[in-house]
Amino acid sequence: MRFFALFIYRPVATILIAAAITLCGILGFRLLPVAPLPQVDFPVIMVSASLPGASPETMASSVATPLERSLGRIAGVNEMTSSSSLGSTRIILEFNFDRDINGAARDVQAAINAAQSLLPGGMPSRPTYRRANPSDAPIMILTLTSESWSQGKLYDFASTQLAQTIAQIDGVGDVDVGGSSLPAVRVGLNPQALFNQGVSLDEVREAIDSANVRRPQGAIEDSVHRWQIQTNDELKTAAEYQPLIIHYNNGAAVRLGDVASVTDSVQDVRNAGMTNAKPAILLMIRKLPEANIIQTVDGIRAKLPELRAMIPAAIDLQIAQDRSPTIRASLQEVEETLAISVALVILVVFLFLRSGRATLIPAVAVPVSLIGTFAAMYLCGFSLNNLSLMALTIATGFVVDDAIVVLENIARHLEAGMKPLQAALQGTREVGFTVISMSLSLVAVFLPLLLMGGLPGRLLREFAVTLSVAIGISLVVSLTLTPMMCGWMLKSSKPRTQLRKRGVGRLLVALQQGYGTSLKWVLNHTRLVGVVFLGTVALNIWLYIAIPKTFFPEQDTGVLMGGIQADQSISFQAMRGKLQDFMKIIRDDPAVNNVTGFTGGSRVNSGMMFITLKPRGERKETAQQVIDRLRVKLAKEPGARLFLMAVQDIRVGGRQANASYQYTLLSDSLAALREWEPKIRKALSALPQLADVNSDQQDNGAEMNLIYDRDTMSRLGIDVQAANSLLNNAFGQRQISTIYQPMNQYKVVMEVDPRYTQDISALEKMFVINRDGKAIPLSYFAQWRPANAPLSVNHQGLSAASTIAFNLPTGTSLSQATEAINRTMTQLGVPPTVRGSFSGTAQVFQQTMNSQLILIVAAIATVYIVLGILYESYVHPLTILSTLPSAGVGALLALELFNAPFSLIALIGIMLLIGIVKKNAIMMVDFALEAQRSGGLTPEQAIFQACLLRFRPIMMTTLAALFGALPLVLSDGDGSELRQPLGITIVGGLVMSQLLTLYTTPVVYLFFDRLRLRFSRKNSKPVVEI
């Protein structure tokens, strides 16, 4: 009593406290960073190693395996995957959430150093690592085009200057430059000219390497001067290499230009990049796992004027893709939704109280509570994101509830003629415990979320804490500022009989009278109501089992990502044509704004594309509808497939799959994996629940096997090392020397000129110089035959792995897809040597599915414990919790009605409903218990009177929560697909709960009261007719 009086009778102090909360909140709001979702990125590090010319199997066994054994000893590694292709190995390390990325990077470097002695010689450089997830979509893509500069020169400028500058921006984790490669001097050998001159390929390589050296020469000095010695020991251009003498034939000098074409070109000619219809160099920028995407993008944009200033006039630098506009638009939509929710809630209060002064009180209390929450968010290190702003939107209905309960009770005393200050004090005292019970039990709902681990726990933590803080501030405001404003602003009202003449008041009175009549009938037919209650419990269980489920709603971020997979024997020239054809099909779609792509590198038959759609307001279709439309057109392209998927704000795992979800096959036997993977993939492709089924197992590439006749080789004076060196020199794009320039280092690349390697007959032109100096054709000691070979070898842990990726057809949920896959695997009878499991997002979904029911039960149990402590009773909490089944039925039916799967967002809605709907029961039970204690009423009379007296605040709080969530349901702008499931769940649950709990709660209250009396061996009081 004195606590409430302290604030009621000291209005200046109370106002200043509220002002301080508001000012701190405004400051926190201005300092809060902006993000699409809470920070949930796993720490990921990518290790890269190269050995040009080495086969995928060689890379896997000699490079990947030693590194994996060393890296696998690092603490905190959640998953380790590797992919080895022609001349390249990439290992992805995904760490636990609590692992510091900088400490992990130090451990990775130490592991690389430890494995160095086990790696093969001939590697052009040591393995390197980068702190970025290659499977993440770039946050920004910049393109460089030029009419006069070559692609190699553009690539050199981009990688040497632009990429280095961008990498220094805070938040940038990796700048991947694609579309070409660094400049190089390429030596294209003529096999016939070499044979005629009697020059081996090794001799050419050694001559080039010896002619281009960079060694210190020292200095000469006398008593006065010192001269540094400098020589022309380096060759830097193709023109300087051409006259190089590599051999003497009968006293005549054989120069490099006599047996080879020497050109200024690039290290790897099998690379191509495009933006729309023009050749381009792409700078694909990814953020650090812990970085904020908006702050990082803003930092890059702020740097663009400086970048453009350093670019020559012949180069055009453009932003091809930027993830931030849709994120900003989505957050703006949420902020507008929040404003609409506040307005609707205030409107509900006005319609019920029919007083401008009374409405002003919650109109002040709600903003103070919401704005004050921003200060706590900043102190907790949170961000303004879709989930935290959705929490505040939903909190609008919660924070007004506390004010409504206090305000309505004070207004009731004023209508009875009590003086304002006395009414404020008395009314607050009567409902103070009720408000505290409602708030504490509501916060208790979120305790299990705060203790939840893994990705879902990290994702929901900001939501739970933000909402809990808003409720806590609301509790303080409703017990201090609200009664003070009531005492000083409101006046004694007209008698209720006069208010009934007004429109809304007359409707409310009519509803209350109708409710009273129907409640009398219900209390005389309790068994029927009991059957209905048990029916809702059973229906909850059936609906939860039957409803389709998914992990997270499919977002429309306005960005698509596509992976091209062509025939495994395709050439680079043909693959570049496929890239152009696919880009033309996509560019012609009316919903597409920009498209970029690249192909080449170690995987000739693959490519990547990034598509930016037009803003949501400029296109009629969602991203998924655009994909469905393009899928039909793209399927007509022969010899290759393009798999499109909408970029999501949450992507789990480090695999670069060509679809959103993955199922991984593991085996210790590579042969068993290669036998069963095609069978499983074929069976999964036939499932209607899956779309775009594809695999990263590529073991059908064209290969030419050379079989050495070792006896013949020994007789001819040739060893295997010389033969292998011949092949590497001829066909491996071998980097044989380094050119040092002030800004970068470039390579000299040697191979047989592509003009002489158009078919297999090129092998017949190869020869080896034996120990006697004679040229021995390769065909003398080797036979060759075509065969199939892998284009890549994949590992997970230390086991051979193959990942089958898939998308979901429109109207199919992830739970339906995973159930179909599990069923198919059982039907196929896959042997135990081949193990299958979901990975990435699908794996997290499986884990979340297993914990959802536990989480709901834990929330209910926590609320029960809190209510039991507050009421000092085992029974009354059960009465209050009896409101939950009807809310669950309403929520699940609403999701089914809107064809929305049960997702993590819908789970949040269910958790919120646990907190919302029990408020009705708390208000009923509190007044019933007080009436029994102080008024001497029977349980039947007490609960009946409580239901009628609390009908108006129950309607007000329910409608306030409903109207607070309604804008989430009706929103259709950017990010609406994320907000709608939450609104649908809450609105559906509130409607059904309001219809049923007004009747089931009194019946359950009486049931438990009679049960209590029976167990305490007391005679029940006779039922009093109402």
Curated annotation (Swiss-Prot):
Cellular component terms (Gene Ontology): plasma membrane
InterPro entries the record matches: AcrB_DN_DC_subdom, Acrflvin-R, Multidrug-R_MdtC
Example of a GO MF term: xenobiotic transmembrane transporter activity
Chief place where the protein resides: membrane
Family designation: Belongs to the resistance-nodulation-cell division (RND) (TC 2.A.6) family. MdtC subfamily.
Subunit structure: Part of a tripartite efflux system composed of MdtA, MdtB and MdtC. MdtC forms a heteromultimer with MdtB.
Protein name per Swiss-Prot or TrEMBL: Multidrug resistance protein MdtC
